[in-house]
């Protein structure tokens, strides 16, 4: 997964465009959300904040990313990923991935950046692109639940991230 993370960062930096995980469902065009933006990441629900080890206002991931070619923040990500020695992390392999190439790496870079640099990075609000947390997505997909709670989550949604995380199976 770390190689794939690095490849998508390189591709987005060089060519620009949009990357979306396979476990996303598009409900409607996100064009109104991203119009005029140069770098975007999808925000995650608060219930996913556990383990990051840092108090932050907004938690986001690399499951949906958009940027123009040569965006400075994407360049910063690439530099950090390829300069990381990796031998500093004595932790579970899942956490290691999150910290070296995944969301925790991105969030540390984002929150360590100057506020003036962060203004150019749009964190797409969770109600638009990640209306469900992990447990809600399981109830919606696997149990086919159609409760008022879940339906209310979808009222403003442009996309749904189901958080299948198939890559976790590979890192046992």
Question: Residues of each region from the PLM?
Answer:
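Glycosyltransferase-associated regions of secretory-pathway enzymes
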Residues: 1-5, 20-172
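Small-residue hinge/turn detector
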Residues: 5-17
């Amino acid at each position: 997964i770390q190689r794939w993370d690095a490849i998508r960062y390189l591709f987005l930096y060089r060519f620009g465009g949009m990357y979306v995980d396979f476990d996303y469902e598009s409900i409607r065009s996100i064009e109104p959300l991203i119009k005029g933006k140069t770098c975007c990441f999808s925000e995650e629900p608060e219930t996913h904040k556990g383990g990051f080890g840092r108090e932050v206002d907004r938690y986001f991931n690399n499951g949906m990313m958009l940027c123009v070619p040569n965006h400075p923040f994407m360049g910063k990500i690439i530099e950090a990923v390829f300069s990381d020695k990796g031998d500093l992390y004595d932790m579970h392999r899942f956490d290691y991935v999150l910290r070296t190439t995944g969301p925790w790496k991105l969030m540390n870079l984002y929150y360590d950046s100057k506020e003036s640099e962060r203004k150019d990075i749009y964190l797409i609000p969770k109600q638009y692109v990640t209306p469900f947390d992990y447990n809600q997505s399981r109830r919606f997909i696997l149990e086919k639940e159609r409760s008022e709670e879940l339906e209310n989550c979808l009222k403003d949604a442009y996309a749904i991230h189901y958080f299948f995380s198939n890559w976790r199976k590979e890192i046992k």
